[in-house]
């Protein structure tokens, strides 16, 4: 359709003479293959659904602005943080994790919290969740997590048995499971939850000094959550309640905000840390590593087209900028390949050209001249006729050695190390988290756990009770009571290796 006169055309500009009536042989005859407009439309329709994300398929997004409110240049020379008051355009996408594109927003689930900052040194993607930890610490388990929380291959239904069988087979998962079964496992909406980078990352400054960091984003709207009963009533009326809440707030000028903080750990502190500081199943205690304010982001513009900006948004932890870097966190290392690879499958090799993914602070003519061709390459004239190799006699495409990162500390031989032999302290932190809850909040953890374990076999329930008891005896007793299981009939002293190996 021509935007100027509102007249309908086909995809290549030819006027459409009749939008409603197909071309036929006679008034009531069969269709003619020369009705090219119909063929063009139906063939496009047949192909317009792209693969959904393997996780985080149901999501909402908005554009906004990040503003620096505190000087952290002692830790990083990243330009996004170069001065107080500096603003950077950004995009955020929130999501559930387990459900498909049409799933309800209010499920007891982790929420995705993905941010894309359009800096002058390129895009910085911080791909996190609304929880500071995860179920495990080795990426080889990620595929099984996907299988366990999604649909059963025989019934094609989600299976609490599969879910809990997997979770309770990993004692280190209890920390994340405790958060998930707590009030924060059912946020009222995306505006009313905190966000976390979750992984350990690093920063480095002009002197080449590296520190390890964790990112925190604290909602300025306040934490609000639903009970299972409240959520069930809302889902019956509105499956898109979190998306609607975010969209309507922005449309009405009630712009949501989050304050950004970091925790900082020096390399020397990391060497002496009692646990593995790169273990995604654990937090750094704030009393030891206090929150340092960095800035605030505000979401103030809804996308004009959901598919263009939200469905096609592509986040990858490999998208970082000078002054920011990775860590030895094995889960982060595993994501460095997986995310970009998934986007290339889902959106194509040139998905960086999609407007929401384009670097805004770097001219497209300067972007990687050796990555050419591929389906739907159009944005930068495919780098024109310039050299597509290096070295060349034109003196272009030179490296930028001033952006070399400081040496990345590593040690040891390449080997499949058993991480359980490195650290089997699975229950200290979930126990502390449980004891921080009010008595009412503890009761809701028990109730939520019983609801979530409905239909799960007794042996799996017993395994979970045993883990909870090891975190705190009252935790185990409360879950057992909610599940109507006599805790006195359970062997609570089974060691962890046996628990993991035998699932008993």
Curated annotation (Swiss-Prot):
UniProt-listed CDD domains: catalase_clade_3 (cd08156)
Name of the coding gene: katA
Reaction(s) catalysed (UniProt annotation): 2 H2O2 = O2 + 2 H2O
UniProtKB keywords: Heme, Hydrogen peroxide, Iron, Metal-binding, Oxidoreductase, Peroxidase
InterPro entries: Catalase (IPR018028), Catalase_3 (IPR040333), Catalase_AS (IPR024708), Catalase_clade1/3 (IPR024711), Catalase_core (IPR011614), Catalase_haem_BS (IPR002226), Catalase_immune_responsive (IPR010582), Catalase_sf (IPR020835)
GO annotations of cellular component type: cytoplasm
Organism superkingdom: Bacteria
Active site per database record: 56, 129
Cofactor(s) of this protein: heme
Single GO BP term: response to hydrogen peroxide
Assembly with partners or alone: Homodimer.
EC number: 1.11.1.6
Sequence similarity: Belongs to the catalase family.
MF annotations from Gene Ontology: catalase activity; heme binding; metal ion binding
Residues that, per the record, bind heme: 339
The protein's name: Catalase
Task performed by this protein: Decomposes hydrogen peroxide into water and oxygen; serves to protect cells from the toxic effects of hydrogen peroxide.
Species of provenance: Staphylococcus epidermidis
Keyword Metal-binding annotated: yes
